[in-house]
């Protein structure tokens, strides 16, 4: 749920990077943060548990236009890697405007990808959200690895709704801004 700041004429939109452990969520966010204009981003905050961390920062892209006279500012979050921290994962989804699902392309990670997808559906349903009505691009990360599944196989198992999807090698920045750009534009369109 977007928050409106009338003083600054901004709409704060929340995008959450969700997916399997070690699938590239944090790497995506760190890459965006490292490349974003310092004047257009807030401070990155890391909330650490004993074995996990959740990252957050806000980001004001330059070229997405306005929504009814307001600039769109995006609060970008990651969720903890493991379903063990489901309470935190669920809490981070509260008030979400868009979700970027980060899938690990490695064949041996497919079961974990599917588990993370089911966990996402369950947590959204607990808030009364329907994923078919939320901007929801998918990034297939680690495309450079020799054991990466074909795009056709990934899509058949992880993208039955045919949402916009992107190939990525987040550690090199490939696909990072394409995925975020698509998700951000989808959120702005949903608000217009």
Question: Which role does the model predict for each range below?
Answer:
Residues 22, 82, 106-108, 142-146, ...:
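Conserved nucleotide-binding/hydrolysis micro-motifs of P-loop NTPases
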Residues 2-49:
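Conserved G1/Walker A P-loop phosphate-binding module
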Residues 144-192:
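Canonical P-loop GTPase G-domain recognition
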Residues 8, 52-55, 65-70, 91-95, ...:
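Conserved catalytic network of the ASCE P-loop NTPase/AAA+ motor domain
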Residues 17, 101, 138-140:
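Structural beta-sheet core signal
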Residues 105-161:
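Conserved C-terminal guanine-recognition region of P-loop GTPase G domains, centered on the G4
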Residues 45-84:
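Switch I (G2) and immediately adjacent beta-strands of P-loop GTPase domains
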Residues 86-108:
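Inter-motif core of Ras-like GTPase G domains
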């Amino acid at each position: 749920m977007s928050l409106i700041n009338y003083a600054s004429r901004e709409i704060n939109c929340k995008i959450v990077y969700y997916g399997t452990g070690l699938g590239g969520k944090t790497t995506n966010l760190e890459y965006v943060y490292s490349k974003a204009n310092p004047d257009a981003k807030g401070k990155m905050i890391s909330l650490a548990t004993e074995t996990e961390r959740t990252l957050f920062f806000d980001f004001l892209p330059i070229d997405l236009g306005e929504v009814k006279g307001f600039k769109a500012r995006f609060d970008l979050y990651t969720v903890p890697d493991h379903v063990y921290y489901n309470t935190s994962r669920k809490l981070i989804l509260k008030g979400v405007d868009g979700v970027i699902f980060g899938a690990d392309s490695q064949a041996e990670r497919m079961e974990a990808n599917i588990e993370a997808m089911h966990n996402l559906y369950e947590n959204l349903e607990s808030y009364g959200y329907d994923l078919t009505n939320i901007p929801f691009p998918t990034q297939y990360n680690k495309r450079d690895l020799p054991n990466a599944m074909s795009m056709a196989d990934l899509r058949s198992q992880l993208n039955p709704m045919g949402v916009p999807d992107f190939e990525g090698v987040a550690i090199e920045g490939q696909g990072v801004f394409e995925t975020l750009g698509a998700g951000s534009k989808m959120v702005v369109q949903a608000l217009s």
